[in-house]
Amino acid sequence: MTFINEINDILWTYILIIMLLGCAIWFSIRTRFVQFRMICEMIVLLSESAGKGKQGEKHVSSFQAFAISIASRVGTGNLAGVATAIAIGGPGAIFWMWVIALLGASSAFIESTLGQLYKIRGKDSFIGGPAYYMKKGLKQPWMGMLFAILISITFGFAFNSVQSNTICAAAEHAFGVNHIILGGVLTLLTLVIIFGGIQRIARVSSIIVPVMALGYVGLALVIVILNITHLPGVIALIVSHAFGWEQALAGGVGMALMQGIKRGLFSNEAGMGSAPNAAATAHVSHPAKQGLIQTLAVFTDTLLICTCTAFIILFSGAPLDGSTNGVQLTQQALTNEIGSSGSVFVAVALFFFAFSSILGNYYYGEANIRFITHRKWVLHGYRILVGGMVLFGSLATLDMVWSLADVTMALMAICNLIAILFLGKYAIRLLNDYRAQKKAGIQSPVFKKESMPDIEKDLECW
């Protein structure tokens, strides 16, 4: 554990925070702050339904691709990750979580647009993501292979261990359920769904995600309304702990910054290279459409759902001395607000949040296993290993699974950020093309690869 923690310190303190913020600021400027200027367009695009392919097959719709990415994003990071960030970094961590979401959404636009641009045709849907744009766009197949290995490990193994660990911790706290029994049930459910393929994952995600998100946000809004007089004080607490002199002298600002960005990235995945795998599956007329929709997903995750958790914890007066950490802190906070049923509600909500994340995480791994090899036995073996890691996570300690996830997440994000820095110019050209068509009165812009002759030969699906 000490060795893993030392690697984490190097990656997060000296490399990733600088790269994340640097890329986020750069792309915000280059896109003229697309994440703010085109919010209304994002909402309109989300309603687009699946179209028919040339052979008449049904594709994954914009909403389903959005649901897959939200299924992965909205999970443990929103309930347990936010609580961990506050417990370790203080309330100021929430401010930096907001910052990385607001600025990092531009990176999400770039990577998801590139995922659409360089996608290829799969058996039952389109397939794409960073591994594909590294190979086809950067002409660096070794880099694509490295990324594919990293994301397959990060999402299929490390992140899914975190999800199952948190589900079991919450269930034990609320119901006294044995970890082994619940871990076995989770593993069985996971295997049944993932062996059904992307279409089954898309259908399940598009049902679970809206219901669970609306239910959780609705409860949080009730709590905010009941504590509305305390809202200015909570916001002031968040800001003061992000910049206060007392915190700066104690090293608290740096801890808040690191925890906010680390847990924010785990939750919203902006710039990490995961969402492009979901974005690439959608059947749309222009790559920029999925870029815009995935930008909205970042806001939905962090500014809405993570903020709900933060307010629930800070309104409750739950101790932030480190005596309670992770999902138990969220459960204790909600119990303080609505009584003993709060712990049960968190356990149930977390089951759906985290289980949908397991499905979304698995799909990211599958898309990249298919990049590495088309051998069916490898894919089946990967599915079984994913189930095994779900079981492992249910039995492991909290610190172990979070530390492993932090290392693999950092390596994956660094690899992707390097790629989008070089390829981002193409996403910006696509954004300009989309804006020009909208300005010309075209209601639904259409991209034709002939408009980019310098890379036309690398684009399979346009």
What kind of feature is each model-predicted range?
Residues 1-76, 87-92, 391, 422-462:
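N-terminal alpha-helical transmembrane segments of multi-pass membrane transport
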Residues 5, 9-45, 87-124, 300-306, ...:
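Extracellular loop-to-transmembrane helix junctions
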Residues 19-26, 31-43, 165-171, 178-226, ...:
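Membrane-interface loop-to-helix entry segments
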Residues 23-28, 100-124, 130-165, 169-194, ...:
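Helix-loop-helix module between adjacent transmembrane segments
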Residues 30-35, 77-82, 91, 155-168, ...:
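Transmembrane helix-loop junctions in multi-pass membrane proteins
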Residues 33-60, 84-94, 106-138, 319-337, ...:
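Flexible loop linkers connecting adjacent transmembrane helices
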Residues 53-88, 114-117, 123-131, 135, ...:
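Alpha-helical membrane segments and immediately flanking helix-loop junctions
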Residues 110-118, 123, 219-237, 251, ...:
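Extracellular/periplasmic helix-exit of transmembrane alpha-helices
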